[in-house]
Amino acid sequence: MLLVMVRSSTISPKSLRLYCSGHIIDSLRHSISRWNSPSGYCSNYYFSKRKHKRHFTSSVLSPVTPIVHNLFDELPERENRTMESSFMFLRDVLRSFMMRTETETPRSVHCFALKCGLLQDLATSSKLLTFYGRTGELVSSSCLFDELKEKDVIVWNSMITALNQNGRYIAAVGLFIEMIHKGNEFDSTTLLLAASALSSLHLSRKCSMLHCLAIETGLVGDSSLCNALMNLYAKGENLSSAECVFTHMEHRDIVSWNTIMTKCLANGHPRKSLQYFKSMTGSGQEADTVTFSCVISACSSIEELTLGESLHGLVIKSGYSPEAHVSVGNSIISMYSKCGDTEAAETVFEELVCRDVISSNAILNGFAANGMFEEAFGILNQMQSVDKIQPDIATVVSITSICGDLSFSREGRAVHGYTVRMEMQSRALEVINSVIDMYGKCGLTTQAELLFKTTTHRDLVSWNSMISAFSQNGFTHKAKNLFKEVVSEYSCSKFSLSTVLAILTSCDSSDSLIFGKSVHCWLQKLGFGDNMLSANSVINMYIGCRDLTSAFLRLETMSETRDLTSWNSVISGCASSGHHLESLRAFQAMSREGKIRHDLITLLGTISASGNLGLVLQGRCFHGLAIKSLRELDTQLQNTLITMYGRCKDIESAVKVFGLISDPNLCSWNCVISALSQNKAGREVFQLFRNLKLEPNEITFVGLLSASTQLGSTSYGMQAHCHLIRRGFQANPFVSAALVDMYSSCGMLETGMKVFRNSGVNSISAWNSVISAHGFHGMGEKAMELFKELSSNSEMEPNKSSFISLLSACSHSGFIDEGLSYYKQMEEKFGVKPVTEHRVWIVDMLGRAGKLREAYEFITGIGEPQKAGVWGALLSACNYHGDTKLGKEVAEVLFEMEPDNASYYISLANTYVGLGGWEEAVRLRKMVEDNALKKLPGYSVIDVRCLDTVS
C-alpha cells in the first residue's frame, strides 16, 4: 500500500530517498533561509531567548501580586501538603486557567510548580508551555522548554503550537527541523503543526516533503493530517496532488470531503466540486453546513439556476433550512443573485431569522450586479435602521463600487466620510483602493490623487486604481508617469495583469502608439500575451491609437482562439473611435467566418456605426436582425436605435422606437430629445419634455437649450436656465457650453459671457462656443484674445473644434493673415492635424477677400483630393465675386462629386445671372428641374411671442 501511494502521488521515489538520507531537512532549511540570518534557522527565536534569559529568572520567580496568590488559597492544609496533592492540584489549576490570558497567571503556576519540583513531569510542563503560548509569553515558554532535560513528542508539539499561535511561523518550522535533526520521535500532530506553519509562510511547494515523512513513518492514515496536506497542496495551486491524497485516504470524514470540495472551488474548478459532492452523497456521508455552502457557491460560479434550486430543496430536506442556518442562507442568496433571480434571493433574505452583515452584503451585491441600484441602497439603509447591523469593510467596498459605477459623487463622498469616522481606512487598504477607484469613475481625479498620495502603505491595487483614474479622465500623461513609477517600485515578477491593462486604456491617440507598443511588449514579457483579456485590450489600444493595421493583425493571429469578445473589441472599438466603416467591415468578416454568433454588444457597435455614417438602410437591417435574433430588445439597444435614426434624419422612426419602449429610462428620453433637436424639431422637443415624469439631468437640459437655440427663443432658453440653476446643474461644463451657444445665437452675447465666466469649471466645448460666438458677431479680435487665454491654460489644450471656431472668427472679421498664421500653427505648435472643416474656413476666408486664385491654389496644393465642402466654399466665393470662369471649373468638379446636390447648380446659375449670362443660367435651372433636384430654402427664426412655458 505504501509503494502504491508513492507511485501514484506526485511524490517521486527520489524525494523519498532524499528523506531517507536526511537531505529533506536541509531542503526545508533552505526554504526558510531567506527569512533568517546565517547564524541559525530559528535565529529570531533563539535571539529572544538569549536576550531575556536573565529577565526570565527574575520575572517568573519574583513575588507576584496578592490577587494572583489567591489562586493557591484553596489548597487544603497548605502547611502539610504532599507531593501528590500538590501535583493533582497543579493539574487542576492548569485545566481551569488554560483559557486565561493574564500574563501573571502562568508565571504564578510556574513558580508553584518550580517550588514543588513538579516541572520534570512532562504532562505538567507541556500544559504549562501551552498556557504560556496562549498568553503570548514566548520568552518564558522558550526558557521553560530549554530547562527540560527530557522532552517527549507532546512537549515538542506544545512548543511548536505556542509559536504558531503567536505568529512565529519561521521559528515553528525551525523548531520542527531541530526536532527531526536530533532524532526525536514525532507524530501526526507534529506534521500537522508543521503543515500549518508552512501554509502561513506560503511555502506550499514544500508540502511534498511533509507528505514523504508521513508516508515513511506510516502516519499518512491520519485523517486530520491528510486534510492538512490537501489544504497545503491546494493552497499552492497543486490540486492534482491534493486529489491524490484524497483518493488514497482510507477513512474520510466530513472535513476531508469539505476540504477537497472547497479547494476545487477555490482553484477555479466548480464542476469538480459538484462531482465530489455527488460522490460524497453516494458514499453515504451526510452533508453539513460547510458542504452545502460550498456546493451552492459552485452553482453560483457556473450560474446553474436549475441545479441551484435543486440544492436549495435538498438543503431544506436535510434539515439545514436557510432560515435557521445563516451561512447556508447567505450562499443561497448569492447563488440566486448571480443567476439573475433577484426575487428568489430577496425572498430567502427576508425569511432569514438571524441576519448578519454577510447576509446583507450578499443581497446588496446581488442587487448591484443585476443593476438594481436603488434596491441596493435600500438594503444599506435597512441594515442600519431596521436590522441594527453595522456595515463592515465588505459593505463599504460594495457601496463605493456602486457609487463609482453610477457616478454618484455626492453619495461616494458620504461613504468616504463614513470610512474616516469609523477608522476603516487605517485598518483595511482595500477601503482606500475602492475610494480611489470611485473618485476616478466620478471624474474627481484631484480627490483620488490626494487620497493616493496621503496613503503611506500602498499595494499594487492602489497604483492600478490611480492609473485607471488618470486614464479614464483623460490625464494620459499623468497615467504614464505613474506607470513608470510602478515599474521602478515593483519588480516585473510582481506585476499583475490589471496594472498593464490599466495603462493600456490611456493609449487613446496616435501620439501614444509607441508607448502602447512598449506596453504590448511588457504583456508578452510578463507572460500575459496569450491571455484573452489582454489580447482584446491590446486590440482596443491599437484602435484607439488609430493603428488599425496592427489591431486587425492582432485579431488575425488569434484565428484559433479569438472569441466573441475579440470581435466585439474590434467592432465596438472602431465604432467608438470614429472608424465606422471598418466597424461594419469587421462585422461582415465575422459573419462570413460563421463560427461565432453576434450578441447585443455586437449590434450596439454596428448600429452606432450605421448612424454615424448616415446609412439608414443599413441601420434598419441591423434593427431587423436585432428583432430576429434577440428575445427582447434591451432598453440600451432601443436607445441606440433612437440615436441612429436621429443621426440619419429619420425622426419618425426615432419617435416610433421610443414609443415602443415599455419603461423608458432617462437615457431614452435624452436620446429622443437629442434626435429631435438635431433635426430642427425644437417645438416637438418642448412638447415631449412636458410629458417627462423623471427627474431631468444635465444631458436633458443640453437638449432643451439646443432646441431653444434653433427656435431663437430666449424665453424657452431662460426658463430652462432657471430650472437647471434650481437643480444645481449650472456648473456642468457641457451645460455651460450650451448656455453660451444659446445666448449668443439669440443675440445676447454679454449674457453668454457672464454665464461662461461665472460657471467656475469650463470644458473645452465651452471655450469653443464662446470663441465661435464672438466670431459670429464679428468680434474677431475678442475671439483671438479668448483663444490666447485658452492656449495659455495649463489644464486643457485647444482641439480640432477650437481651431474651427477660431478660423471661423478670422473669416467673418477679415483677419486673413492671422487666420493663415493660426492654420500653420495648428500642427506645428499644437499638434492638431487639419481636417476638411479647417480648410473650408481657409477657402472661405480667402474667398471673402477676393483672393480666389490663392484659394484655388490652396486646395490643389494640399496634395490629396478634397471633399465637396471645400470646393463648395470656393464656388460660393466665385458666385459672390462674379468669377464665372473659375466658378465653372469648380462647379464641374462638384458635379462629379455630388451630382444630386441642387445648391451647386443654383450657385453657378446665380453667378451667370449676375454677369448677364441668362442662357447658361436657364440651362442650369432646367437641369435641376429635369433631375427633380431640390434646394432646401434658407430661413430665419425670431421670437415674437411665446405663451408656452417649460414645466
UniProtKB/Swiss-Prot annotation:
Signal peptide: none annotated. It is found in: Mitochondrion. One of its GO terms (cellular component) is mitochondrion. The keyword NAD does not apply. Belongs to the PPR family. PCMP-E subfamily. One of its GO terms (biological process) is RNA modification. The gene is PCMP-E2. It comes from Arabidopsis thaliana (Mouse-ear cress). This is Pentatricopeptide repeat-containing protein At4g19220, mitochondrial. Residues 870-945 are annotated as: Type E motif. PPR repeats lie at residues 121-151, 152-186, 187-221, 222-252, 253-287, 288-322, 325-355, 356-386, 392-426, 428-458, 459-489, 496-530, 531-561, 563-597, 599-629, 634-668, 669-695, 697-731, 732-762, 763-793, 799-829, 835-865. The lineage of its organism: Eukaryota, Viridiplantae, Streptophyta, Embryophyta, Tracheophyta. Keywords: Mitochondrion, Repeat, Transit peptide. GO terms for molecular function: RNA binding. Residues 1-63 form a transit peptide.
